[in-house]
Protein backbone atom coordinates (compact mmCIF):
# COMPACT_ATOMS: atom_id res chain seq x y z
CA UNK A 1 0.00 0.00 0.00
CA UNK A 2 1.05 3.59 -0.65
CA UNK A 3 1.25 4.42 3.06
CA UNK A 4 3.35 1.39 3.99
CA UNK A 5 6.63 3.27 4.37
CA UNK A 6 5.35 6.01 6.65
CA UNK A 7 2.59 4.30 8.63
CA UNK A 8 3.11 1.87 11.48
CA UNK A 9 -0.11 -0.14 11.21
CA UNK A 10 -0.53 -3.71 10.10
CA UNK A 11 -2.10 -4.23 6.70
CA UNK A 12 -4.63 -6.56 5.17
CA UNK A 13 -3.06 -9.34 3.11
CA UNK A 14 -4.20 -11.12 -0.05
CA UNK A 15 -2.24 -14.21 -1.04
CA UNK A 16 -2.71 -14.75 -4.78
CA UNK A 17 -1.64 -17.50 -7.14
CA UNK A 18 0.05 -16.89 -10.53
CA UNK A 19 2.17 -13.91 -9.51
CA UNK A 20 3.54 -13.39 -13.03
CA UNK A 21 0.08 -12.32 -14.25
CA UNK A 22 -0.89 -9.97 -11.42
CA UNK A 23 1.16 -6.79 -11.71
CA UNK A 24 2.88 -6.36 -15.08
CA UNK A 25 1.94 -7.62 -18.51
CA UNK A 26 5.61 -7.90 -19.52
CA UNK A 27 5.98 -10.81 -17.09
CA UNK A 28 2.60 -12.35 -17.92
CA UNK A 29 1.94 -15.42 -20.02
CA UNK A 30 -0.40 -13.79 -22.55
CA UNK A 31 0.60 -10.11 -22.30
CA UNK A 32 -2.40 -9.45 -20.03
CA UNK A 33 -2.42 -8.55 -16.35
CA UNK A 34 -4.81 -8.23 -13.42
CA UNK A 35 -3.73 -4.63 -12.59
CA UNK A 36 -3.91 -5.52 -8.91
CA UNK A 37 -1.26 -2.94 -8.00
CA UNK A 38 -3.14 -0.16 -9.79
CA UNK A 39 -6.33 -1.11 -7.96
CA UNK A 40 -4.64 -1.01 -4.55
CA UNK A 41 -2.99 2.32 -5.40
CA UNK A 42 -6.41 3.67 -6.34
CA UNK A 43 -7.83 2.61 -2.98
CA UNK A 44 -4.97 4.37 -1.20
CA UNK A 45 -5.56 7.56 -3.18
CA UNK A 46 -9.32 7.58 -2.62
CA UNK A 47 -9.03 6.92 1.10
CA UNK A 48 -12.44 5.25 1.42
CA UNK A 49 -11.58 1.55 1.56
CA UNK A 50 -8.42 -0.01 2.92
CA UNK A 51 -5.91 -1.48 0.46
CA UNK A 52 -3.93 -4.65 1.10
CA UNK A 53 -0.48 -6.08 0.77
CA UNK A 54 -0.69 -8.50 -2.16
CA UNK A 55 1.62 -11.50 -2.04
CA UNK A 56 1.93 -13.20 -5.43
CA UNK A 57 2.83 -16.89 -5.49
CA UNK A 58 4.86 -17.73 -8.58
CA UNK A 59 3.91 -20.67 -10.77
CA UNK A 60 5.67 -22.75 -13.43
CA UNK A 61 5.28 -21.55 -17.02
CA UNK A 62 4.81 -25.12 -18.24
CA UNK A 63 1.08 -25.85 -18.08
CA UNK A 64 1.53 -29.44 -16.92
CA UNK A 65 3.81 -28.42 -14.07
CA UNK A 66 1.25 -25.78 -13.13
CA UNK A 67 -1.55 -28.36 -13.20
CA UNK A 68 0.49 -30.51 -10.80
CA UNK A 69 1.11 -27.58 -8.45
CA UNK A 70 -2.58 -26.66 -8.41
CA UNK A 71 -4.39 -30.00 -8.12
CA UNK A 72 -4.78 -32.94 -5.77
CA UNK A 73 -3.74 -36.51 -6.61
CA UNK A 74 -3.15 -38.19 -9.96
CA UNK A 75 -5.22 -37.54 -13.09
CA UNK A 76 -4.87 -37.61 -16.86
CA UNK A 77 -5.10 -34.59 -19.12
CA UNK A 78 -6.05 -34.86 -22.77
CA UNK A 79 -5.63 -31.49 -24.46
CA UNK A 80 -8.07 -32.16 -27.31
CA UNK A 81 -10.97 -34.62 -27.32
CA UNK A 82 -9.77 -36.07 -30.63
CA UNK A 83 -6.23 -36.92 -29.52
CA UNK A 84 -5.10 -40.08 -27.81
CA UNK A 85 -2.09 -38.45 -26.21
CA UNK A 86 -2.51 -38.21 -22.46
CA UNK A 87 -0.42 -36.34 -19.92
CA UNK A 88 -0.37 -37.93 -16.49
CA UNK A 89 -0.50 -35.25 -13.81
CA UNK A 90 0.84 -35.99 -10.34
CA UNK A 91 -0.91 -33.29 -8.34
CA UNK A 92 0.73 -31.98 -5.19
CA UNK A 93 -1.71 -29.19 -4.38
CA UNK A 94 -1.87 -30.33 -0.76
CA UNK A 95 1.85 -29.53 -0.48
CA UNK A 96 1.33 -26.22 -2.29
CA UNK A 97 -1.34 -25.23 0.23
CA UNK A 98 0.82 -26.22 3.19
CA UNK A 99 3.81 -24.31 1.79
CA UNK A 100 1.70 -21.19 1.34
CA UNK A 101 0.18 -21.23 4.81
CA UNK A 102 3.10 -22.59 6.83
CA UNK A 103 6.13 -21.13 5.07
CA UNK A 104 5.19 -18.16 2.89
CA UNK A 105 2.60 -16.71 5.28
CA UNK A 106 4.93 -16.99 8.27
CA UNK A 107 7.77 -15.35 6.35
CA UNK A 108 5.55 -12.49 5.20
CA UNK A 109 4.27 -11.89 8.73
CA UNK A 110 7.80 -11.84 10.16
CA UNK A 111 9.22 -9.63 7.42
CA UNK A 112 6.44 -7.11 6.71
CA UNK A 113 3.72 -5.37 8.67
CA UNK A 114 1.23 -7.95 7.49
CA UNK A 115 -1.76 -8.64 9.69
CA UNK A 116 -1.97 -11.99 11.46
CA UNK A 117 -5.67 -11.48 12.14
CA UNK A 118 -7.56 -14.02 10.01
CA UNK A 119 -10.33 -11.45 9.46
CA UNK A 120 -7.79 -9.42 7.47
CA UNK A 121 -6.39 -12.28 5.38
CA UNK A 122 -7.60 -13.57 2.00
CA UNK A 123 -6.51 -16.12 -0.58
CA UNK A 124 -7.33 -15.71 -4.27
CA UNK A 125 -6.68 -17.25 -7.65
CA UNK A 126 -8.05 -17.92 -11.11
CA UNK A 127 -8.61 -21.03 -13.20
CA UNK A 128 -6.71 -23.85 -11.44
CA UNK A 129 -5.52 -21.16 -9.04
CA UNK A 130 -9.20 -20.66 -8.20
CA UNK A 131 -9.44 -24.38 -7.43
CA UNK A 132 -6.47 -23.95 -5.10
CA UNK A 133 -7.93 -20.86 -3.42
CA UNK A 134 -11.04 -22.85 -2.53
CA UNK A 135 -8.91 -25.75 -1.30
CA UNK A 136 -6.71 -23.52 0.86
CA UNK A 137 -9.81 -21.83 2.25
CA UNK A 138 -11.36 -25.15 3.24
CA UNK A 139 -8.22 -26.62 4.74
CA UNK A 140 -6.89 -23.55 6.56
CA UNK A 141 -10.00 -21.84 7.93
CA UNK A 142 -8.18 -20.86 11.12
CA UNK A 143 -5.84 -18.64 9.10
CA UNK A 144 -8.00 -17.35 6.23
CA UNK A 145 -11.40 -15.66 6.37
CA UNK A 146 -11.80 -14.56 2.74
CA UNK A 147 -11.65 -16.67 -0.41
CA UNK A 148 -11.86 -15.35 -3.98
CA UNK A 149 -11.98 -17.88 -6.83
CA UNK A 150 -12.16 -16.43 -10.34
CA UNK A 151 -13.23 -18.83 -13.10
CA UNK A 152 -12.26 -21.84 -11.00
CA UNK A 153 -11.78 -25.04 -13.00
CA UNK A 154 -13.69 -27.62 -11.00
CA UNK A 155 -14.39 -30.42 -13.46
CA UNK A 156 -14.68 -33.99 -12.24
CA UNK A 157 -13.00 -34.99 -15.50
CA UNK A 158 -10.18 -34.57 -15.93
CA UNK A 159 -8.96 -32.84 -12.74
CA UNK A 160 -11.05 -34.66 -10.13
CA UNK A 161 -13.11 -31.76 -8.87
CA UNK A 162 -14.95 -34.14 -6.57
CA UNK A 163 -11.78 -34.30 -4.43
CA UNK A 164 -12.17 -30.59 -3.70
CA UNK A 165 -15.88 -30.98 -2.95
CA UNK A 166 -15.13 -33.85 -0.59
CA UNK A 167 -12.57 -31.70 1.23
CA UNK A 168 -15.08 -28.85 1.59
CA UNK A 169 -17.63 -31.20 3.14
CA UNK A 170 -15.03 -32.90 5.34
CA UNK A 171 -13.73 -29.56 6.64
CA UNK A 172 -17.17 -28.18 7.42
CA UNK A 173 -17.17 -24.72 8.99
CA UNK A 174 -14.82 -24.19 11.91
CA UNK A 175 -14.66 -20.42 11.36
CA UNK A 176 -16.97 -18.15 9.31
CA UNK A 177 -15.68 -17.20 5.88
CA UNK A 178 -16.76 -14.98 3.01
CA UNK A 179 -16.37 -16.97 -0.20
CA UNK A 180 -16.61 -15.44 -3.68
CA UNK A 181 -16.57 -17.49 -6.88
CA UNK A 182 -17.43 -16.49 -10.43
CA UNK A 183 -17.41 -17.48 -14.08
CA UNK A 184 -17.72 -15.69 -17.41
CA UNK A 185 -20.52 -16.86 -19.68
CA UNK A 186 -18.18 -17.12 -22.70
CA UNK A 187 -15.43 -19.21 -21.15
CA UNK A 188 -14.12 -22.15 -23.14
CA UNK A 189 -11.27 -24.54 -22.28
CA UNK A 190 -9.61 -27.32 -24.23
CA UNK A 191 -11.85 -29.95 -22.72
CA UNK A 192 -15.13 -28.19 -21.94
CA UNK A 193 -17.39 -25.28 -22.77
CA UNK A 194 -19.32 -22.60 -20.88
CA UNK A 195 -22.20 -24.78 -19.71
CA UNK A 196 -19.97 -27.40 -18.10
CA UNK A 197 -17.89 -24.77 -16.32
CA UNK A 198 -20.99 -23.03 -15.01
CA UNK A 199 -22.59 -26.30 -13.90
CA UNK A 200 -19.54 -27.25 -11.86
CA UNK A 201 -19.39 -23.80 -10.29
CA UNK A 202 -23.00 -24.25 -9.20
CA UNK A 203 -22.16 -27.69 -7.85
CA UNK A 204 -19.40 -26.23 -5.68
CA UNK A 205 -21.74 -23.48 -4.48
CA UNK A 206 -24.22 -26.10 -3.34
CA UNK A 207 -21.40 -28.05 -1.69
CA UNK A 208 -20.27 -24.98 0.24
CA UNK A 209 -23.79 -24.39 1.48
CA UNK A 210 -24.18 -28.07 2.34
CA UNK A 211 -20.98 -27.83 4.39
CA UNK A 212 -22.52 -24.96 6.37
CA UNK A 213 -21.07 -21.83 4.76
CA UNK A 214 -23.59 -19.00 4.88
CA UNK A 215 -21.64 -16.18 3.21
CA UNK A 216 -21.14 -17.46 -0.32
CA UNK A 217 -21.47 -15.28 -3.40
CA UNK A 218 -21.31 -16.58 -6.96
CA UNK A 219 -21.47 -14.49 -10.11
CA UNK A 220 -21.93 -15.16 -13.82
CA UNK A 221 -20.21 -12.38 -15.76
CA UNK A 222 -21.82 -11.55 -19.10
CA UNK A 223 -19.45 -11.55 -22.06
CA UNK A 224 -16.35 -12.53 -20.09
CA UNK A 225 -13.81 -15.04 -21.34
CA UNK A 226 -11.19 -17.09 -19.49
CA UNK A 227 -8.43 -14.48 -19.30
CA UNK A 228 -6.66 -11.91 -17.16
CA UNK A 229 -8.53 -8.92 -18.57
CA UNK A 230 -11.82 -10.39 -17.38
CA UNK A 231 -10.39 -11.18 -13.95
CA UNK A 232 -8.95 -7.67 -13.72
CA UNK A 233 -12.45 -6.26 -14.23
CA UNK A 234 -13.97 -8.51 -11.59
CA UNK A 235 -11.28 -8.37 -8.92
CA UNK A 236 -12.20 -4.94 -7.47
CA UNK A 237 -15.81 -5.92 -6.82
CA UNK A 238 -14.80 -9.24 -5.31
CA UNK A 239 -12.25 -7.60 -3.03
CA UNK A 240 -14.65 -4.94 -1.78
CA UNK A 241 -17.37 -7.52 -1.16
CA UNK A 242 -15.03 -9.89 0.67
CA UNK A 243 -13.40 -7.31 2.94
CA UNK A 244 -15.92 -4.49 3.18
CA UNK A 245 -19.30 -6.03 2.38
CA UNK A 246 -19.80 -3.74 -0.60
CA UNK A 247 -22.52 -5.10 -2.87
CA UNK A 248 -21.92 -4.37 -6.54
CA UNK A 249 -22.47 -6.06 -9.88
What are these regions (language model features)?
Residues 1-249:
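Non-catalytic cap/lid and distal C-terminal segments of serine-dependent acyl enzymes
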Amino acid sequence: PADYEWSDRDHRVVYMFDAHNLFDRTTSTYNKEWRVDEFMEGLSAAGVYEPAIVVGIDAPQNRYDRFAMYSIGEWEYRRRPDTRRLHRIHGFGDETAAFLMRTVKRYVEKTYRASRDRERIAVAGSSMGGYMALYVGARFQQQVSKVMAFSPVLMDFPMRGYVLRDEIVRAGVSQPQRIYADMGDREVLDFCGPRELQDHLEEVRLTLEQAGHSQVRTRLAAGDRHDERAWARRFPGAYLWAFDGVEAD
